[in-house]
């Protein structure tokens, strides 16, 4: 019973620490370019929308490859 209580308290404490750190670190990322998807997609040679993207193609799609038609498609706009 004591071990169960200790485990529950430890989990709650670690969860609280995670939430506190997540709130404090918003907007303070030092190297934003490392996580930028636009720079990665510009630097990567990719297949444009409307072209074949099956298993024999060595490049990746700029958007996503449709699993049924094997045609590259752009991501839908939100």
Curated annotation (Swiss-Prot):
Q: Which cysteines are joined by disulfide bonds?
A: 46-62, 53-65, 61-72
Protein localization: Secreted
Q: Which UniProt keywords apply?
A: Calcium channel impairing toxin, Disulfide bond, Ion channel impairing toxin, Knottin, Neurotoxin, Presynaptic neurotoxin, Secreted, Signal, Toxin, Voltage-gated calcium channel impairing toxin
What tissue expression does the UniProt record report for this protein?
Expressed by the venom duct.
Q: Which stretches are tagged as propeptide in the UniProt entry?
A: 23-42
Q: Show which residues constitute the signal peptide.
A: 1-22
Q: Which GO terms describe its cellular component?
A: extracellular region; host cell presynaptic membrane
Annotated function: Omega-conotoxins act at presynaptic membranes, they bind and block voltage-gated calcium channels (Cav).
- Note what the entry says on domains: The presence of a 'disulfide through disulfide knot' structurally defines this protein as a knottin.
List the protein's name. Omega-conotoxin-like 12
Which source organism?
Answer: Conus striatus
């Amino acid at each position: 019973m004591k071990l169960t209580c200790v485990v529950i308290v430890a989990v709650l404490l670690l969860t609280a620490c995670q939430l506190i750190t997540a709130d404090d670190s918003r907007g303070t990322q030092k190297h934003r370019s490392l996580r930028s998807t636009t720079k990665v997609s510009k630097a990567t040679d990719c297949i444009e929308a409307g072209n074949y993207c099956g298993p024999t193609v060595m490049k990746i799609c700029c958007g996503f490859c449709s699993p049924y038609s094997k045609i590259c498609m752009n991501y839908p706009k939100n």
